[in-house]
Design a protein with these regions (language model features):
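Carboxylate/His-rich catalytic cores and anion/metal-binding grooves
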Residues: 174-177, 191-214
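Short, solvent-exposed turn/loop segments enriched in Gly/Ser/Thr/Pro and often Arg
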Residues: 198-201, 212, 271-278, 753
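Conserved beta-strand positions
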Residues: 270-271, 684
Length: 920
């Protein structure tokens, strides 16, 4: 049997040799591929046909070593230089710039096809754009276009910095695509256009390459506890750079979106690394309700095709299905699935560098099954242990990508027809099914967020119309499915067998705090009175009335705090106060938190109104008779650990986008002490782990571990720097944090960080709550104000929605429940429900009708998403205000600064900053 198997492989090899039409095989390169592959089953013969080209340099000729060679990875400047060489030496390669990262590095796309494809690239892009809009292209016209059009296949790599194989592999693949005369490669070159995004996140990639050469290259063991990842990837965002597809806030996402809308690729394939040995995405489900059935079926067909091709070449460990679900639409590559294309991804096993390690797979499970078990979706599993090299990773990913490109090359017309048909289906649904449109009134509590919602829809390619008083979004358009998905609540199945891969709710009106009306019919709408928006909209606030004082009606608008900082920067003498309670002034009601500005002038207020989208009323009223709090804007610090910077990065990004000044601090600042002399507020964003991890940080046995910018490692030291990442603040730093609060400071802790602060005793009245069987993946749920006199809830109604994921709960003793400012759900905790039974010695009292009516009217807890056993959380604390000494600890048991997405929740943090010294 073994001899027969080897004979088949030998036959395949000779067939490939015959295909290259007497091209000279690069024996040195191919031998090195063998040398750095640890097992012959990890290397298909199809990759051993790399040729020597007289004009086009191979990676070996260019770099002096092959791709996947032990100990070698390349910075973006080196990667781009190689592609530039290909573009200069081959007419089949086009290289174009696609913008800049936050740190100033370039994004590029590399386009590969035959000479005709490159020469007529604009024509092919025009054809896919026409197929993308069924309103402009009839079925008959589409068929004519399909006859001459070519599918565009977009392949991206390097989104996650530690996943280091694919950016290297793509250089070898590009060389293969432009030099090989093998039949299957020629088909790819001639029948499709391949677009390569060589490094999706250049900032993170360069940091990680420097990290590898500085700290991890040559380490003896993979699982020795040493951090395999650099602490920062992008300037702000770590792994969540692949969770930005709804916000489109980071440069990486903007570049991906720009590429999609320029090329309208038929398929997008994002290359990642995690599970063994090669996962081809389909997902376990449940699938997103608004992904066209054609796309869902394409996932299955293409996924199984790729796994079959890898298996056909004798490579074990390829599988589909048992990883990821297919629900959350905010991944980067989902720009394809959300816009009638096909978004897919691979996960290849990786070592976070170019070293070889013995890896143990024996306990790894996915979808409940061992990674080494033989299943219907994994017909040829890997052994419980594998000796895994960098080149193994290159082989697997490249084999899969070539198989996928070949599928597109041989099924191009079907893929193009499906692409058009999905857009056609979306338009038809918009025409025949409800909702027919959505209207967004401009006059709302936060008009700037109304404009933001309109802009965010346009970022997604959704058409928005405008009249004098509202925005109108018609459903009869190519991205109708995405529109309805974004604007209506999600209902995740409670009986789903496997836990969701990410958040399960994303209803933008709730996340933004904007009222939206869904229209079942368009009757009565004069569509000619609306104009199509072609550029970003902005709400310019207005100033009415007359007088020397200016008052702003506060309704938890996101831009109030930034406006106050801007005013103080322009005019240090400006007087700022806020109303402590609701007041009637000149027959107009102003709620608690409304801002009164004096010692300024009309021009400054007009500038604030226009810049920040806020309305003011000039008044000559005597405000001294109203109870007010003078505003002393705080000096804010945002704390970051060196072991988990994900959410700290989102917090920094949010503060910078809003225009709220802050200082970034770490363990060394806490250890140095004297915090209150420098800061009034310290924010600790969500951080993983427990109190022990928070105190100790990165294991000091690995120190010193510098993260500093040097000539040898120029990408390090950004956005923060330290001579030694190891160790944490220690008990001394925690005591300094306690003293900061006792001296009058405000400590704000978000989600898991709040639990850590409670565990450390910094919020002594708070204790952890056993949540039992509660399962609370990221969903939009109801919260209720318990203490309306607290300025933290200024601008919020009694009940409102928030976004919450799985996180720890906290609680106080019953006699301290006044520390609870907001609770989950509308019903009280069981120990707060009045006893209604008989009491010995007292006359029985019947349950009042009023109480019964109130119970019947309580709102559902889940607004969008799904929560199992919600009774375990209803009544528990959402926000606590704990006095400590002269200061306060404000504990949020959810994250109000989640991924720059839940903007409606963030003003509770802004309220805390405005009122930091008035929370007693």
């Amino acid at each position: 049997m073994k001899k027969r198997y080897n004979a088949i492989l030998l036959l395949i090899f000779f067939l490939y040799l015959g295909q290259v039409n007497a091209q000279q095989i690069d024996q040195v390169y191919n031998q090195k591929i063998k040398d750095f592959t640890t097992d012959k089953r990890f290397l298909p013969q199809s990759l051993l046909d790399l040729v020597v080209h007289p004009n086009i340099p191979s990676p070996l000729k260019h770099f002096g070593h092959i791709i996947g060679e032990e100990g070698h990875v390349h910075r973006t400047s080196e990667i781009y230089a190689y592609y530039q060489q290909l573009a200069e030496t081959s007419p089949m390669v086009h290289m174009q710039e696609m913008g800049e990262t936050e740190e100033g590095r370039k994004f590029y796309l590399i386009v590969i096809g035959d000479e005709k494809s490159i020469q007529n690239l604009d024509q092919y892009k025009t054809q896919t754009a026409l197929l993308a809009d069924a309103r402009k292209t009839s079925v008959e016209e589409a068929e004519k276009i399909i006859e001459t059009a070519k599918p565009i296949y977009y392949v991206s790599a390097g989104m996650h910095a530690t996943e280091m194989g694919a950016p290297e592999m793509l250089m070898e693949l590009a060389y293969r695509l432009v030099t090989s005369e093998a039949v299957h490669i020629k088909e790819i070159r001639e029948n499709i256009i391949t677009v390569i995004n060589p490094v999706s996140e250049p900032d993170g990639w360069d940091k990680q390459v420097d990290w590898y050469y500085r700290h991890t290259k040559g380490r003896e063991l993979f699982d020795d506890g040493f951090p395999r990842s650099v602490p920062y990837w992008g300037k702000y965002v770590f792994h969540d750079n692949n969770r930005d597809g709804l916000q489109v806030s980071q440069a990486i996402t903007k570049s991906i979106f720009k590429g999609f809308f320029e090329f309208h690729p038929t398929v997008m394939l994002d290359l990642h690394e995690s599970v063994p040995l090669l996962y081809v995405s389909t997902g376990t489900g449940p699938y997103n309700d608004f992904v066209d059935p054609i796309t869902q079926s394409e996932w299955q067909v293409m996924g199984n095709h790729d796994v079959a091709e890898v298996a056909a070449q004798g490579m074990p460990g390829a599988f589909t299905w048992a990883f990821y679900d297919g629900w959350w639409p905010g991944y980067g590559i989902w720009v394809a699935n959300n816009h009638n294309s096909n978004g897919r991804f691979y996960e290849t096993y990786g070592n976070a560098g170019a070293d070889t390690y013995l890896r143990d797979l024996s306990t790894s499970r996915y979808a409940g099954d061992l990674a080494t078990s033989k299943e219907w979706y994994r017909p040829d599993p890997a052994t419980p242990q594998v000796l895994w090299s960098f080149r193994n990773n290159i082989n697997y990913t490249q084999t899969g990508v070539i198989a996928s490109l070949s599928y597109a090359a041989n099924n191009g017309k079907m893929l193009l027809r499906n692409f058009y048909k999905k857009g056609f289906n979306s338009v038809e649904k918009g025409r025949t099914e409800g909702p027919k449109a959505f209207t967004i009134a401009k006059a709302q509590r936060d008009p700037a967020m109304v404009a933001y919602l309109a802009n965010q829809l346009m970022v997604q390619g959704i058409e928005v119309h405008e009249s004098a008083d509202e925005y109108l979004v018609l459903s009869e358009q190519p991205y109708r499915n995405l529109l309805v998905s974004l604007m209506t609540p999600q209902a995740y199945p409670k009986d789903a067998k496997f836990p969701p891969y990410d958040a399960i709710a994303w209803t933008l009106p709730n996340l933004y705090g904007v009222e939206v009306d869904a229209l079942g019919e368009l009757d009565g709408k004069n569509l000619s009175s609306y104009k199509l928006l072609t550029e970003e909209v902005k709400y310019d606030g207005k100033v009415d009335g007359s007088g020397n004082a200016f008052i702003h009606t506060y309704q938890a608008q996101n831009n109030v705090l930034p406006a106050l900082y801007a005013l103080k920067q322009q005019n240090k003498n400006a007087g700022i106060t806020v109303l402590k309670k609701t007041e009637s002034i000149n027959e107009k009601v102003f709620p608690a938190g409304s801002v009164i500005i004096t010692k300024t002038n009309l021009n400054q207020i007009k500038q604030l109104a226009e810049t920040f989208g806020l309305d003011f009323e000039a008044s000559s009223a005597d405000f001294s008779r109203f109870e007010q709090k003078s505003i002393n804007l705080p000096r804010v610090a945002i704390y970051h650990t060196w072991y988990n910077t994900q959410d700290e990065g989102w917090s920094r990004y949010t503060f910078e986008q809003r225009g709220i000044p802050y200082t970034s601090i770490d363990k060394d600042e806490l250890k140095a002490g004297n915090l209150k002399s420098k800061y009034d507020v310290i924010l600790i964003p969500r951080v993983r782990g427990n109190a022990k991890m928070f105190i100790n940080g990165v294991d000091s046995k690995f120190g010193p571990m510098p993260y500093t910018q040097t000539a040898e490692f120029p990408s390090h030291g950004v956005p923060a720097s330290t001579s030694d990442m190891t160790g944490g603040p220690g008990f001394g730093g925690i005591e300094h944090l306690r003293k900061f609060v006792q001296d009058g400071g405000l400590l704000i802790a978000l989600e898991n960080s709040a639990a850590i602060m409670a565990e450390l005793g910094l919020a002594p009245e708070l204790s952890p709550v056993s949540s039992g069987s509660l399962f609370h993946p990221g969903s939009i749920v109801m919260a209720k104000v318990r203490k309306s006199s607290s300025p933290i809830v200024n601008g919020y109604p009694e009940e409102f929605s928030i976004f919450r994921g799985n996180g720890p709960l906290l609680q106080t003793n019953k006699y301290n429940r006044d520390l609870m400012l907001v609770q989950y759900g509308s019903k009280p905790l069981k120990d707060e429900i009045p006893y209604e039974g008989p009491i010995l010695g007292m006359t029985d009292k019947p349950k009042s009708e009023k109480v019964e009516a109130k119970e019947e009217k309580s709102k559902p807890y889940v607004v969008a998403g799904m929560v199992r056993n919600e009774q375990e959380i209803i009544g528990h604390g959402t926000v606590f205000n704990v006095p400590v000494g002269r200061g306060n600890v404000l504990a949020f048991t959810f994250d109000p600064l989640h991924r720059f997405l839940n903007h409606h929740d963030a003003p509770m943090v802004w309220n805390a900053l405005i009122n930091w010294d008035g929370l007693r």
